[in-house]
A protein has these predicted regions:
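N-terminal basic, amphipathic alpha-helical segments
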Residues: 1-133, 339, 343-350, 361, ...
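Conserved glycine-rich beta-strand-loop-beta hairpin in the small C-terminal domain of fold type I
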Residues: 375-385, 395-407
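Conserved core of the PLP fold type I
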Residues: 143-277, 289-290, 295-306
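Conserved core segment of the aminotransferase class I/II
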Residues: 305-375
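Amphipathic, non-transmembrane alpha-helical secondary structure
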Residues: 19, 23, 187, 191, ...
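Short beta-strand "wing" residues that participate in macromolecule-binding interfaces
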Residues: 68-70, 171, 428
């Protein structure tokens, strides 16, 4: 039990109470301006709380402008942080602003295993600028023009042709919406489909930010277990029948965080179950092009003839994150409702980024780059797997994507391991963040795509030492 919080308190709010206690102590002058705050370990021991709780409290201080981080040194108070106006401003505690994954990813560390993003050196930086110039040459008025809310017609037409050729998707450009990234697409879908207390099926484990979005609209999440072989379809059918969900959010291709891929046979059956129970399937497909040997099966949308699949295809992670481009394929009336929500959200994704993406993605040069990128990521995955072997961990080898879903040795908890890792400039994603039941404290997600090859080897050696210290 924390020394500063009653035992009846909600555990999820404990870090906020710690933050409030720190603010009071700052106000009392216990720490001087620009002075160093106690280390995460020291304050956790003093207060009788977990180190991860103190880490989250320090992150709140940082976000509110009262503290800053020095790399490999710790947290320091900012000048002026003791002013009455600042200390009187309470931390904002709304659910929407709680994002544990974002908190972890913002920590400046040397060994960054929490980011399912590409090492910037793997992106097509050398010739991206050429396509930016080409966009201005071909569309000189691009900055003086709003894009249509649904997206640039030229891009939507090219995307419809691409999806038809690559994945056998039968759709028109009118059934596509261009969004500013996949996360906006998820938010628009939740906004148009959900009302408080609606049930939503989600994979267990799943993408943590998606759960945050759905919960922010009042959804009640029901977990569907995903395994290396896919889903227990009897469980899916039972939950669809009993919970009558508004939709089932799933990630069947190089699943985040597990890396699993659902077979074509199961995809067909999932679409049949969706039609049988009148449940929309929301398919999130961020890694379709990141395969190491054979391409994955076609998206669920390819098997849908009755409008029970909304397909989100994103490209930002491996093309150019700054472009923030995704496409949503859906039938009527879903696409019409999304269009209305998009018009209220931002009235259209910027035309310039759409034109740059159009020129870049469909070029022969980009397709050659993707072939090299798959090889580079496969090499990095192998490096991480080799480094992880022999230290008591287990995982299922993925056939693509950016992550390993790793089971820790018996008795080792992900939260404790992360707290130690942060102290040693290493981060990863604890399994609890990916679990709708907030369990999986014996699992971690390690991303092999952001760190370079030397950092992968050195970081895993450091991780092995941390594991030994907790064994």
């Amino acid at each position: 039990v924390s020394k500063i919080y009653p035992s009846a308190a909600q555990p999820a709010r404990l870090y906020e109470s710690v933050c409030d206690d720190i603010l009071k102590r700052i106000d009392r002058g216990e720490w001087s301006e620009r002075g160093k705050l106690p280390s995460i370990r020291e304050l956790a021991q003093e207060l009788g709380v977990h180190r991860l709780t103190v880490f989250k409290a320090y992150q709140l201080l940082k976000q509110s402008g009262k503290a800053y981080v020095k790399d490999k040194s710790g947290y320091y108070l900012k000048t002026g942080s003791l002013s009455p106006d600042l200390t009187a401003t309470p931390a904002v505690h709304s659910h929407i602003q709680q994002n544990p994954l974002s908190d972890i990813q913002r920590v400046p560390v040397v060994y960054q295993f929490s980011q399912a993003l590409l090492d910037p050196n793997l992106l097509p930086n050398q010739y991206l600028s050429a396509y930016v110039k080409q966009a201005f040459d071909l569309y000189p008025k691009v900055l003086g023009t709003y894009a249509p809310v649904q997206g640039d017609p030229e891009l939507r037409e090219a995307m419809a042709e691409y999806l038809a050729a690559e994945h056998r998707l039968a759709l028109t450009s009118g059934e596509l919406l261009i969004t500013s990234g996949a996360q906006q697409a998820l938010d628009l879908l939740a906004k148009t489909l959900l009302k408080p207390r609606d049930a939503v099926l989600v994979d267990r484990p799943t993408y943590g930010a998606a759960m945050d979005i759905f919960r922010s609209y009042g959804a009640q999440l029901a977990a569907v277990d995903i395994h290396p072989h896919g889903y227990d379809l009897e469980q899916v059918a039972r939950l669809m029948k009993e919970r009558k969900p508004r939709f089932f959010y799933l990630n069947p291709t190089f699943h985040n965080p597990t890396g699993y891929t659902v077979s074509a046979e199961q995809r067909k059956r999932l679409v049949e179950l969706a039609a049988e129970h009148r449940c929309l399937l929301v398919e999130d497909d961020a890694f379709h092009d990141i395969y190491f040997k054979q391409p994955p099966p076609p998206p669920l949308f390819a098997y849908d003839t009755e409008g029970y699949v909304a397909y989100i295809r994103s490209f930002s992670k491996y093309i150019a994150p700054g472009l923030r481009i995704a496409a949503v394929a859906a039938r009527s009336p879903v696409i019409g409702n999304l269009l209305t929500a998009k018009s209220l959200a931002d009235n259209g994704t910027p035309l310039l980024t759409q034109k740059i993406f159009l020129l870049l993605f469909f070029s022969d040069r980009m397709q050659r780059h993707l072939e090299k990128l798959r090889i580079a990521l496969h090499v990095r995955m192998n490096i991480m797997e080799e480094a992880l072997s022999g230290i008591g961990l287990s995982w299922t080898k993925p056939a693509g994507g950016l992550n390993l879903w790793v089971k820790l040795p018996d008795g080792v908890k992900a939260g404790a391991l992360l707290a130690k890792g942060i102290e040693q400039s290493l981060t990863f994603v604890p399994g609890t963040i990916c679990d709708p039941l907030a369990e999986f404290d014996d699992r971690i997600r390690l991303s092999y795509s952001y760190a370079n090859e030397n950092q992968l080897r050195e970081g895993v050696r450091l991780l092995a030492g941390l594991l030994r210290s907790l064994a």
